[in-house]
Amino acid sequence: IIEYHGTLFAAWYNCEEKELIGPTPIRQKRSKDGGKTWSDIETVAEDQTGKILFCPPVYGICEDKLYMLINEMVSADHIHALDLYVFQEEKDCFEFLWSKPIPFKLNTNVYKMANGKLLLPGRIAELDGFPNTPAVLISDSGKIDDDWRLVYIQENGDLPDGSKLVHPEITAIIEDNKIAMFSRDDERKVPLVYLSQDYGETWSDAFSYDIPFSDSKIYAGTLSDGRN
């Protein structure tokens, strides 16, 4: 979900049978009254053959343009491509820009950092493989439709105690050059946090923390009054 020019945009992957089985079109609604009422459903991307699964949609705003990034998958969580769409206000719809063979699983909206660069948290795999390694994409130009550079948060999906990361879905709190990146940890069911002091270029080892949390998605954010 994101706010753009006074409108809330909310998008999801619509599993018509069960999660990531069969067609998974990306659908969207809009609200012009702060979420009290919503528009009819719009379809942004779909493959009715079910050969390509879409998941998940995330948003970003750059140079006053609204973008949506979507993963293509060949099976559940096996990443085939990263797709980019831009919202055309004059046409009142999203239009496809490009698709690149980047096996990076999205999780959060685009973050703009204090150094002008953009950050996308997620997890990486081999092409058409399962992403079990936390990583970030960085846009050095600060533009969403430009090249993105991959930075590993850790070398692979192995933890020091011998357990393995399964779905290391990550989310960030950013303050100037400092980033706290929170990660799901399925096997131990103890959430992890990684720290960066240089805008996501290098990362600490994983720490455990005491926020009650299980093996499910986690999202962080900063409110308008500065609270995280």
Functional labels for PLM-detected ranges:
Residues 56-57:
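Charged, often glycine-rich, active-site loop that binds/positions anionic groups
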Residues 2-52, 61-216, 222-228:
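Beta-rich carbohydrate-recognition and catalytic domains
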